[in-house]
Amino acid sequence: MKKQSKILIVSHQYLPHVSPRTTRWKLIIDELTNRGHEVTLLTGTYPDFENKNINVIYFGNKNNLNIVSNLREKSKRAESKKLRTKFFYSLLKKIYRFFIKFVAWPDYSMFWIYQIFKNRNNITTDYDVIISVSLPFSSHVVAYIINKKKKKHWIMDIGDPFSLKIDAPENNRLLYSGLNNHYEKKFYSLANTILFTHKNALESHKKYFKIPSKKLVVANPI
């Protein structure tokens, strides 16, 4: 990486969403900006925080950040009203959960990918390095869309397995296991550097996807 680079970080999850991953990347971004790098964050999480040191590009619906919670709240408010209204919101919540569990690809944030694709010409391509952060895997799909023509240095940060995830898979494996494997393997072949926070995860992905050792790095968690 250059002494002072323009870095585009693609992470669907970021602050104020709290998780080990968002906390880790907040610390990394702080370190990058302290070293003089120019950082732009592309996210699907409404940036309800002061962002003096970075540029934030947000695509999403800030009025509906969590559809299930939104529907649950409306269902509660409907308790004192008509039973039919309460049933309607409860049904919508179940339909949404069914869709995310059995139909959505690659994961719950598939509509964010659509928003990025629709607005791709409005997203900056003035960067030296692009970094995509999962989970969700959608962040890597978005980075691929943006970097497809630019072909700048691509760093993938793998927080959790995608195709190799056995418990609580990100999508319907009966429908999408082939698609999962195809795109994960494709992205690993295109990325210049692939980060894993655990050596065991690195080794299992290296073996399964036949990733060259020179691309792989064990990056420290928090």
What name fits each language-model region?
Residues 42-114:
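A conserved catalytic-core segment of Leloir-type glycosyltransferases
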Residues 152-153, 170-203, 207-217:
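Active-site-proximal region of nucleotide-activated glycan assembly enzymes
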Residues 15-17, 114, 118, 138, ...:
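A short, histidine- and acid-enriched strand-loop-helix "catalytic/donor-clamping" loop
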Residues 27, 113-119, 138-141, 145-149, ...:
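Membrane-proximal helix-turn-helix segments that form the acceptor-binding/catalytic region
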Residues 1-66, 193, 199-202, 213, ...:
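N-terminal subdomain of nucleotide-sugar transferases
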Residues 86-88, 116-139, 152-155:
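Short N-terminal targeting/anchoring amphipathic segment
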Residues 7, 129, 133, 144-165:
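Active-site proximal beta-strand in glycosyltransferases
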